[in-house]
A protein has these predicted regions:
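Ribokinase/PfkB-type carbohydrate-kinase core domain
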Residues: 1-23, 29-237
Length: 237
């Protein structure tokens, strides 16, 4: 089972033309547009390539839902269970790209990251309880956009047979979406800055942060390298 934030990744390819004569901004010429199902959907598609069955649990927006794109993007062995949130959009991240150098010029978030209301939280909690007993593994892709709260995280930690967690720090949640939200995780995927934020330590090495500070899990995988621990939770050199 994969549970996490629904994200639509939009790429707008534009040619910079120069500074506007009357405004302090760069004018661009539109060239092309690509839209992909990202976030929890991208993670589930990867998992589906090596697993027989994958279940996605998430929420999408009632406004600009992109449901057709999402459903057409998923592999055949993936089952989608999602709730539409009233008067909210599916999170869409629009990146404006200079195609000449494939450089991102700037990004626009179309989203509402307010927490789930009580009815939505109850729905998510029931789905976790329903599907956890039949799952070999639960993967959490927590991008910090309002899907998971303390209540549903607690249920995940109590019910998952094996819990793998990625808590991403991004421009929308800097400092508010840390791995320390999860009292239990069997497998954690964070990068060095995310580990530093979790223990409020800007300058120590990543080995010291994980080996000596309060990040207690069997294995941590970063985006740049892997760090393994022995049975005594000591860093293997």
């Amino acid at each position: 089972m994969v549970i996490g934030d629904a994200i639509i990744d939009e790429y707008l390819y534009v040619d910079p033309m120069g500074k506007s004569a009357k405004e302090n901004m760069i004018a661009t010429r539109f060239r092309d547009r690509e839209v992909f199902a990202g976030g929890v959907f991208a993670a589930a598609n990867h998992v589906a390539s090596i697993c027989k069955e994958v279940e996605i649990i998430t929420t999408i927006g009632e406004v600009d839902s992109y449901r057709e794109l999402i459903e057409s993007s998923l592999k055949k062995n993936i089952k989608l269970t999602c709730l539409s949130r009233e008067n909210k959009p599916t999170t869409r991240k629009s990146r404006f790209i200079d195609p000449g150098y494939m450089r991102k010029l700037f990004e626009v978030y179309h989203f509402d990251d307010s927490p789930l209301n009580s009815n939505e939280t109850n729905w998510l909690a029931e789905q976790i309880k329903k599907h956890s007993p039949n799952s070999d593994l639960i993967i959490v892709t927590d991008f910090g956009h309002g899907l998971l709260n303390a209540h549903t995280i607690s249920i995940l930690c109590d019910s998952a047979p094996f819990l793998a967690v990625n808590t991403q720090t991004n421009s929308a949640n800097l400092g508010y979406n840390l791995i320390t939200k999860y009292p239990r995780a069997d497998f954690v995927c964070i990068d060095a800055p995310e580990a530093q934020l979790a223990v409020i330590d800007r300058f120590s090495s990543i080995e010291k942060i994980i080996g000596e500070r309060n990040i207690d899990m069997a294995r941590i995988v970063g985006k740049q390298r892997k760090l393994d621990f022995n049975k005594n939770n000591k860093l293997d050199k």
